[in-house]
């Protein structure tokens, strides 16, 4: 954002970077001119060579409306925010925590990076939207697509652990609840984040060894995000129950956690730290700088078609809006206290007709997003990062996983890694995976597979 790259951090990786961590000068305004330099530096560290022009030019590119017809169609048919910023110039876990808690500062590291995941599981004690809703008699669920480990549960583990068995369910249950008019007051929907990507996230990352070009992520395509969004929108559009939740009294909000490092020209404005008294976090970050823009679309028959909202918003605008609408009490932190609600978007006096909404269908996706066997059941880098901490928590709670699972010298194939994810996820989130006799059988199959993998060749 600031074009700042300390000479001693040029070509350095996350583990070797040193103070002052490429930090800008106090009070500096983002110049939005450091994307290529940062990409070249990280690429060189990761792959052991300088990128070519065609390689580093990718960070300045974007997708055309024709390549993402569902996303583009929703933006044109409903309302789009063109000044919606993520909360932290960092990774997934931090920004997702701000969506639902307006902070991540209780962590010992200040919550500046995804890892170590164990800190999130043990120490993120911040009050969440879900806790506040429940205390005031409101209902909620987290619906998860194609995965047994909900990131919302991992991020807010200490606060939500007692609700894992009841409030975290497969996405198919959302479709059923939407059709029946039985959606809760607040639904959070997680796309597929662990098995490849179903979240508009292209494949990313390479093996972290110089000169090795193996992908860490399984094959991925933004078209899988298009497929999922079309399915989600279809379920929303068809909500016609005469009682309970329906399309006329329910809003679909589409947002992202962070932009991933690709180019943008609009600098983020200043933000207050969630807790000004909190100590600096990892990399000496004080949470007083915002991340940059992400897409945000609001879908409702009460939204004027083709609207573009120019007011500045961030993820905590969701909390500010819900606090106002439902009387949820005091702000969670100084960040959502300063956030602007977006209730002004519901400006129509009469609703539009859902049957007349014009949103194109998704383009065909590659086979590895239709049938996971095509990618050998590979987990994404995010899935691989989250799993060790969840495994440790499962072992501590008595799940009898084979010892090889925690042996750093034992090579887990992608299929074994996937099977472990299924079992560990089902242990904590029983609605997300096998239970009872099926769980026992899957554990025995895993033990046998691990035993076979360690047998010496004849």
Regions found by a protein language model. Give the residues of each.
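N-terminal pro-sequences and low-complexity stem/linker regions of secreted or lumenal proteins
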Residues: 1-458
């Amino acid at each position: 954002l600031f074009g700042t790259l300390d000479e001693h951090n040029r070509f350095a990786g996350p583990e070797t970077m040193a103070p002052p961590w490429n930090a800008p000068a106090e009070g500096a305004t983002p110049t939005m001119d450091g994307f290529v330099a940062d990409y070249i530096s990280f690429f060189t560290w990761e792959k052991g060579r300088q990128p070519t022009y065609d390689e580093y030019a990718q960070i300045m590119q974007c997708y055309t409306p024709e390549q993402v017809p569902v996303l583009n169609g929703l933006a044109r048919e409903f309302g789009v925010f063109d000044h919606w910023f993520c909360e932290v110039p960092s990774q997934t876990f931090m920004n997702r925590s701000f969506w639902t808690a307006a902070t991540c500062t209780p962590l010992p590291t200040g919550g500046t990076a995804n890892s170590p995941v164990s800190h999130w599981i043990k120490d993120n004690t911040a009050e969440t939207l879900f806790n506040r809703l429940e205390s005031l008699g409101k209902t909620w669920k987290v619906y998860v697509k194609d995965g047994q480990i909900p990131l919302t549960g991992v991020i807010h583990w200490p606060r939500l652990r007692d609700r894992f068995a009841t409030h975290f369910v497969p996405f198919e249950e959302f479709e059923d609840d939407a059709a029946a008019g039985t959606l809760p007051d607040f639904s959070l929907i997680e796309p597929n984040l662990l098995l490849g990507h179903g979240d508009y996230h292209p494949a990313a990352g390479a093996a972290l060894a110089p000169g090795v070009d193996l992908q860490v992520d399984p094959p991925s395509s933004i078209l899988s995000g298009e497929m999922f969004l079309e399915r989600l929108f279809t379920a929303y559009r068809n909500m016609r129950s005469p009682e309970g939740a329906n399309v006329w009294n329910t809003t679909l909000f589409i947002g992202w956690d962070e932009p991933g490092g690709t180019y943008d020209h609009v600098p983020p404005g200043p933000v207050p730290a969630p807790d000004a008294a909190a100590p600096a976090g990892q990399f000496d970050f004080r949470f007083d700088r915002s991340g940059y823009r992400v897409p945000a679309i609001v879908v409702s028959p009460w939204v004027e078609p083709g609207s573009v909202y120019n007011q500045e918003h961030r993820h905590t605008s969701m909390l500010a809006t819900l606090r106002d609408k439902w009387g949820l009490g005091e702000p969670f932190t100084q960040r959502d206290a300063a956030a602007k609600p977006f209730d002004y978007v519901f400006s129509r006096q009469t609703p539009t007709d859902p049957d007349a909404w014009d949103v194109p269908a998704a383009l065909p996706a590659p086979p590895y997003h239709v049938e996971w066997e095509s990618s050998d059941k590979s987990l994404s880098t995010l899935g691989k990062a989250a799993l060790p901490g969840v495994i440790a928590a499962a072992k501590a709670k008595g799940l009898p996983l084979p010892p090889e699972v925690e042996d750093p010298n034992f090579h887990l194939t992608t299929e074994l890694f996937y099977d472990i994810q299924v079992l560990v996820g089902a242990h904590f989130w029983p609605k997300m995976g096998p239970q009872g006799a099926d769980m026992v059988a899957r554990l025995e199959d895993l033990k046998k597979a691990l035993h076979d993998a360690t047998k010496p060749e004849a």
